[in-house]
Amino acid sequence: MVTEKVSLTEEEENILKESVGKKMLLVTSADDSNFSTDFNWTIYFSFEKFYIKIEREDIVAKFFDAFEDGGRPKVERISRDEIKKTSTKTINRIVKDVDLISVTAEFSNYKITCPKAIVFKFDDCNLVIEKFWLFSLAGFKIFLNSADNENFGLTDELQFWYNAESNSKKPIITQEIKAL
């Protein structure tokens, strides 16, 4: 069996940890779908004094060909000028913690462990950046999640973008977050 492990670098993990205790102001996507699809390939996070970019970086599984690639989150600290605004949502919440959730998938004689989601935790909800299909050309789905109701804690007041009614399949990561 071919075994592969893909993970964030120590530098990338440190960038994410730097956000703990800081106020996240905005989340911005370079995609023009207003966060309604899983084709968000580049996501920007604006904090009071710094900026982070999470981008889908291609990984080609040894077992698959180039057309069935996956994508891992690549995390970078950037300048404000590098943000390409298309869709923006206001967050205005202090990050209490950041979790990186990895999964292991097996296909025939191939096994890979790779990042599945990055979760920014706030007092009242979680902001989830999830790669739904490990080996697809899609990017990340971004949504708010909270254990307090069936609609992932979303309210009109928050004006967020994940609509449970339009998607009969709940995000895979939802149950894992509720269990934390």
Model features per residue range: what roles?
Residues 1-180:
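Surface-exposed, interaction-prone regions used to assemble/regulate multi-protein complexes
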